[in-house]
A protein has these predicted regions:
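FAD/FMN-dependent oxidoreductases across multiple families
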Residues: 90-195
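Predominantly flavin-linked oxidoreductase catalytic cores and closely associated redox partners
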Residues: 1-110
Length: 195
């Protein structure tokens, strides 16, 4: 299979650095920040005694003494989303009792009180891939012509920042713009990855 252009948008677990190495290229410099942060989320219906004059709240961590935090949001149809957050390797558990225990250890009892008679509406979902990583392909002295990496294959963020989709969209828009200019001027795709 041959192609003038190959776009790697395979995500944060891209195999591109391994493939480049196997082809005799250096691998890109990689910068990484790992806050050792994890999340556990679950939907609930509040218990009959629940009263709140707010639709969202958060309990902030008091690190390093208490590396636990939480967010509680009304989402739709009378459902509330609770997300427990742990930093510095204090990961919130995804089992029933561990989830409640983590909530009881928060710096504020609000979430634990909510859980006392809240009705779970589904499983607990956990996430621990919170590393922010940038692969600097631009720092490579040699790079294959006709190959472009974009989105999380280049830079992936901790999902709490909400930046990943924005960066991927900006990358796609920029690639579209560069390709349109190259096609309009009949310019070759050589060197495309460095533009």
């Amino acid at each position: 299979l041959s192609s003038e252009l190959v776009v790697d948008a395979t995500g944060k677990n891209t195999k591109l650095p391994k493939w480049l190495s196997a082809l005799g290229f250096n691998v890109p410099k990689e910068e990484m920040i790992d806050p050792k942060m994890g999340y556990a989320s679950r939907l609930f219906r509040p218990g009959p005694g629940f009263r709140a004059d707010w639709r969202a709240t958060e309990v902030s961590a008091q690190a390093p003494q208490n590396p636990r935090a939480a967010g509680l949001w009304e989402v739709e149809d009378g459902q509330w989303l609770l997300t427990l957050i742990g930093i510095n390797g204090t990961y919130p558990p995804t089992d029933e009792e561990g989830f409640k225990e983590f909530a009881r250890a928060l710096p504020n009892p609000l979430v634990a009180n909510f859980l006392e008679d809240a009705i779970p509406l589904g499983p607990i979902y956990g996430h621990r891939g919170s590393k922010t990583r940038r692969r600097n392909y631009g720092s490579m002295k040699r790079f294959p012509d006709g190959l472009v990496a974009t989105g999380d294959a280049v830079c992936s963020f901790n999902p709490i920042y909400g930046q990943g989709m924005t960066m991927a969209s900006q990358g796609a828009i920029e690639l579209d713009s560069v390709l349109k200019k190259r096609i309009a001027t009949k310019a070759p795709l050589r060197g495309l990855a460095r533009t």
